[in-house]
């Protein structure tokens, strides 16, 4: 009798400048075989000098769990790539030509794309016999309506330099909107949804009938909601003002807006659990930071209610969205006249998994939906394998 074939698995890699997250996932069952995160890559005190060493460490971790990539049913390596620009909006089989084009997109995402491209090169060298596939954060928002995607700036400049609203966290927004429809037992085409992805990076989207019609992030992941270290929406005049008066260079300003702004800039803390403790201790900076975060979030919810006209579902996801009941409560407070009423008991319940937290008589259903970007990436990879 022949041995049964192992279930197919995809190794999903999500590379940052100093970190490498990985998950070995079965796209058909949704089961995770292994997951982990290599941090502090390249730091002086780290034992992991570069991404080559980090990926080799991933293989060691898998081997320690008795997982052999050669015999476990590995069918693809999926790479999360933050920015696909105008040209990449489908899961894409990686080759030298594609990787070269991704390198050229680095100015659009200087903090995110270079480490992803580096990881792709290392992974292809270490696993040369397995298809490597890029899945883009921007893909879901590729077909935003022109009125939502277009910035009101000089059209020639915008066309030459490919300036538009690209949107990010698209894999999460797509997955959560699909899971919300499945939870409600309704066709996604019949639902108008608002998805709030709230983590250290945060974004909102409006999804009509399964297609995005608005999102908060723009040309880069810097626009939109207040985030852990990013400012979100900002008067562009601030950049010129700091350049002229504070004598800061563009790179310094960009670094400040990405790494020393948001909750960290306002309160000196980006972790919401520690921020909550600071608020409980009466820290005025922490209180203000929280108020600014909630105010911005409520503005976007209100705007998207108007954009959609009729809203069926609001879903919270990602670390803060899934686990911080106070954020959910304060975001939707006083919106009963807009059709949104929370059930306080349901909202405060710490149970995991997809769940309804709105009142039974709320015209708009409010859900908590755990995101699973790795599973979504793995399934996108399999769609490419079917097509080739």
Curated annotation (Swiss-Prot):
The record marks 169, 230 as: Transition state stabilizer. The active site is at residue 137. Keywords: ATP-binding, Cytoplasm, Kinase, Magnesium, Metal-binding, Nucleotide-binding, Transferase. GO terms for biological process: acetate metabolic process; acetyl-CoA biosynthetic process. Mg(2+). Can also accept Mn(2+). One of its GO terms (molecular function) is ATP binding. ATP binds at residues 21, 197-201, 271-273, 319-323. One of its GO terms (cellular component) is cytoplasm. Substrate binds at residue 80. InterPro entries: Ac/propionate_kinase, Aliphatic_acid_kin_short-chain, Aliphatic_acid_kinase_CS, ATPase_NBD. Its EC number is 2.7.2.1. Pfam families: Acetate_kinase. It is an enzyme of class 2 (transferase). Signal peptide: none annotated. Mg(2+) binds at residues 14, 373. Homodimer. Belongs to the acetokinase family. PANTHER family: ACETATE KINASE (PTHR21060), ACETATE KINASE-RELATED (PTHR21060:SF15). This is Acetate kinase.
């Amino acid at each position: 009798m022949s041995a049964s074939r192992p279930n197919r698995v995809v190794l999903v890699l999500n590379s940052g400048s100093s970190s490498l997250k990985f998950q070995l996932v079965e796209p058909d069952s949704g089961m995770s075989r292994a997951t982990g995160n290599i941090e502090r890559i390249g730091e002086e005190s780290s034992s992991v000098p570069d991404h080559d060493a980090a990926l080799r460490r991933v293989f060691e971790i898998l081997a320690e769990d008795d997982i052999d990539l050669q015999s476990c049913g590995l069918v693809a390596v999926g790479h999360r790539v933050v920015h696909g620009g105008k040209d990449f909006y489908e899961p894409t089989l990686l080759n030298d030509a594609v990787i070269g084009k991704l390198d050229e997109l680095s100015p659009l995402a200087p903090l995110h794309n270079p480490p992803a491209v580096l990881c792709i090169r290392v992974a292809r060298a270490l696993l040369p016999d397995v298809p490597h596939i890029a899945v883009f954060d921007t893909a879901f928002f590729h077909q935003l309506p022109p009125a939502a995607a277009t910035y009101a700036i000089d059209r020639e400049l915008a066309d030459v330099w490919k300036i538009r609203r690209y949107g990010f966290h698209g894999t999460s927004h797509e997955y959560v909107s699909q899971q919300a429809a499945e939870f409600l037992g309704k066709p996604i085409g019949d639902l108008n949804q608002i998805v709030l992805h709230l983590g250290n990076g945060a974004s909102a989207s409006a999804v009509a009938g399964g297609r995005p019609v608005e999102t908060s992030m723009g040309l880069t992941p810097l626009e939109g909601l207040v985030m852990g270290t990013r400012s979100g929406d900002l008067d562009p005049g601030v950049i010129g003002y700091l350049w002229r008066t504070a004598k800061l260079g563009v790179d310094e300003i960009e670094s400040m807006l990405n790494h020393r702004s948001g909750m960290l800039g306002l309160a000196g803390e980006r972790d919401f659990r520690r921020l909550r403790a600071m608020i409980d201790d009466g820290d005025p900076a922490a209180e203000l930071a929280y108020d600014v975060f909630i105010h911005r979030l409520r503005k976007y919810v209100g705007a998207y209610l108007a954009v959609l006209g009729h809203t069926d579902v609001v879903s919270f996801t990602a670390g803060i969205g899934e686990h911080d009941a106070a954020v959910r409560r304060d975001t939707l407070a006083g919106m009963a006249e807009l059709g949104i009423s929370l059930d306080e008991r349901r909202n405060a319940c710490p149970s995991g998994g997809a769940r309804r937290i709105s009142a039974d008589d709320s015209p708009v259903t409010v859900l908590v939906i755990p995101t699973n970007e790795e599973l979504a990436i793995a399934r996108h990879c399999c769609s490419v394998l079917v097509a080739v």
